[in-house]
């Protein structure tokens, strides 16, 4: 019988029968900026489908990730990874904090994608952290930071092209990485998920927002937008 190991805002981790494997289940929960939790019926099923599809695509271009296989509508089998305590945020368009903190016009397109690191902590409200701090805290080595940056940009470039192909703009995405040990050596591995829960996705022509950005003001449209994204990706 599988044992619950951890429950986050939108996913639950369970033990698996084999060592170094886990079961990741996608729930319908979503957390608003106010901290209130809401349920979007069917969201977890769509996120499982979308993330499984995208992780498979990334594996095909040589990006090591924790996804092994989809078990059922809500669950997938994943590799255990020692997850880094940071998130990597890549943005190609002014949105979110760039509008609030820098006064940029929403939708302004950057010459090159901008990369930020944030502490992976809801308790501390995901503060920005720089490379010098990451090194001094002992969270990653310099080589690991370099590898994470290279992989993150490669992932963002690939996903941007994939989404453009289905009429969607990848405005921003949040990526998480970790290390997997093979004897004394370790490899960097992409973890978590890639879905409308952690990507800002806009219609490429109208800039109409899709995914999690609808939660605050148009929650009734959330499922429909996730479904649209899943259906568009089926075309690839």
Curated annotation (Swiss-Prot):
Q: Name one GO molecular function term.
A: ATP binding
- Is Ligase included in the keywords of this UniProt record? yes
Keywords assigned by UniProt? Answer: ATP-binding, Ligase, Nucleotide-binding, Purine biosynthesis
Give, as one word, the top-level EC class.
ligase
Question: What reaction does this enzyme carry out catalytically?
Answer: 5-amino-1-(5-phospho-D-ribosyl)imidazole-4-carboxylate + L-aspartate + ATP = (2S)-2-[5-amino-1-(5-phospho-beta-D-ribosyl)imidazole-4-carboxamido]succinate + ADP + phosphate + 2 H(+)
**GO BP of this protein:** 'de novo' IMP biosynthetic process; cobalamin biosynthetic process
The record's listing under InterPro entries reads: SAICAR_synt/ADE2_N, SAICAR_synt_PurC, SAICAR_synthetase
Family annotation (Pfam families): SAICAR_synt
In short, the EC number is 6.3.2.6
Q: In which pathway does it act?
A: Purine metabolism; IMP biosynthesis via de novo pathway; 5-amino-1-(5-phospho-D-ribosyl)imidazole-4-carboxamide from 5-amino-1-(5-phospho-D-ribosyl)imidazole-4-carboxylate: step 1/2
Example GO CC term: the record gives:
cytosol
Query: What does the record list as coiled-coil region(s)?
Result: none
* Family (UniProt): Belongs to the SAICAR synthetase family.
PANTHER family for this protein: MULTIFUNCTIONAL PROTEIN ADE2, SI:DKEY-6E2.2
Protein name, as recorded = Phosphoribosylaminoimidazole-succinocarboxamide synthase
Gene behind this chain? purC
């Amino acid at each position: 019988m599988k044992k619950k190991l951890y429950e986050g805002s939108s996913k639950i981790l369970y033990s698996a029968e084999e060592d170094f494997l886990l079961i990741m289940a996608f729930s319908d929960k979503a957390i608003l900026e106010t901290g209130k939790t809401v349920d979007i019926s069917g969201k977890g099923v769509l996120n499982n489908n979308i993330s499984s599809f995208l992780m498979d695509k990334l594996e095909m271009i040589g990006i090591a990730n924790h996804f092994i296989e989809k078990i059922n509508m809500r669950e997938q089998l994943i590799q255990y990874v020692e997850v880094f305590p940071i998130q990597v945020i890549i943005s190609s368009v002014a949105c979110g904090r760039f509008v609030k903190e820098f006064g940029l016009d929403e939708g302004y397109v950057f010459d090159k994608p901008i990369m930020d690191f944030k502490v992976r902590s809801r308790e501390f409200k995901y503060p920005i952290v720089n490379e010098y701090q990451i090194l001094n805290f002992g969270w990653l080595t310099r080589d690991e930071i370099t590898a994470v940056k290279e992989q993150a940009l490669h992932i963002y470039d690939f996903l941007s092209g994939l989404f453009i192909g289905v009429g969607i703009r990848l405005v921003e995405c949040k990526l998480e990485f970790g290390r997997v040990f093979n004897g004394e050596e370790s490899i960097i591995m992409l973890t978590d998920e890639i879905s409308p829960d952690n990507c800002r996705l806009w219609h490429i022509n109208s800039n109409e927002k899709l995914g999690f950005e609808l939660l605050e003001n148009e929650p009734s449209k959330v499922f429909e937008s996730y479904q649209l994204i899943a259906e568009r990706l089926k075309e690839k």
